[in-house]
Amino acid sequence: MLVTTTENIVGRTVLEVKGQVFGVVVRSRGVGGNFVASLRTIFGGEIKEYSSMIEEARRHAIDRMVVNATAMGANAIVMMRFDGSEIGQIMSEVVAYGTAVVIDKP
């Protein structure tokens, strides 16, 4: 499935708008991961434990969004965006969202 952050796809025509679509993932590093990450904050720099967790969560959110768009009968997603928030102090929510559409075949 084609997923793009743009409104239009060059050379393709949107035939039908299916509607909004999203994928949600909530992750927690766990006590051990949080402890290691908190030690890294003392010295500064990138907290790789959280970077890799968020990167993986984004990939999974996109995968879930694609599954939902496919169930709606779409073959593309336009205007894809990410949103994220913290739930409590130990969990992160990542949402991938966009507009599910049917585009013409090349």
Tell me what each language-model feature is.
Residues 1-33, 71-72, 92-106:
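N-terminal presequence-like segments and the immediate start of the first folded domain
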Residues 6-9, 82-87:
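Short, solvent-exposed loop/turn elements at beta->coil junctions and helix N-caps
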Residues 21, 26, 34-81:
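Short, well-ordered alpha-helical segments
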Residues 46-47, 86, 100:
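Gly/Ser/Thr-rich beta-alpha loop segments that engage phosphate groups in nucleotides
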